[in-house]
Amino acid sequence: CFTSNDIYGETSLNFIKEFPHADIIKSKRIDALANNIYKSTKGYLPYSRCLTKAKKIKELANNSYPGIEVNSCEVNNLINIVDIIIYNSNKLDEVKKDIINLAKQTPYFDIINSIYGIGETSTAQIIAELGDINRFENIKQLNAFCGLDPTIIQSGKSINYNGPISKRGNRNARKILFITCCSIIRSSVLHNIDTDILVYYRKKQAEKKHFKECITACSTKLLRIIFAMCKNNSLY
């Protein structure tokens, strides 16, 4: 009913806090369960979907055999843990807003944020890791800073200048670029938009590259785009 990705989301946590035991769910009407879900989603999820989820949860509760009583200390502990998670999540959201506001004070925010598929949070993270992009004289320096520069492999008289990436640079920057590329590709496919990153990803797929190689190549491509845009002070 709640996927593993959503278990720590607002909807799941509010539901668990309100109905922390199967016996409590058994005693509630389906519409009461659905109303809780609908309220937490702020209307984003259609009420019919909320009813479907509520029916499934009710069915699972009716077929369950809890190992603890509804008034046990474990149930109270669960409620307390949920409160802590909600509190920390709210604080994390506040920190994200502060980081975004700081990033907006730089000349790079609007430029990077104009790239399709990159949201404000990702933009702020990229700026936080790359810093002042104008301090890099060329893209090779920026690639090396992120550890995306290729290694040189020498075997006898043979030299391969296009080996695997060095991974010697900023690993956080690589991770953010990797995740951002995945987000751009998903959004591009969902909305049927042939962005530069999606086109490049499909090109690498056609070359029979495996997923990680494709995304690594896309990360390098994205970094080149960001570097050129920031140097030329131009939007996407």
Show the residue positions of the predicted features:
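A detector of single, family-specific signature residues
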Residues: 1-236
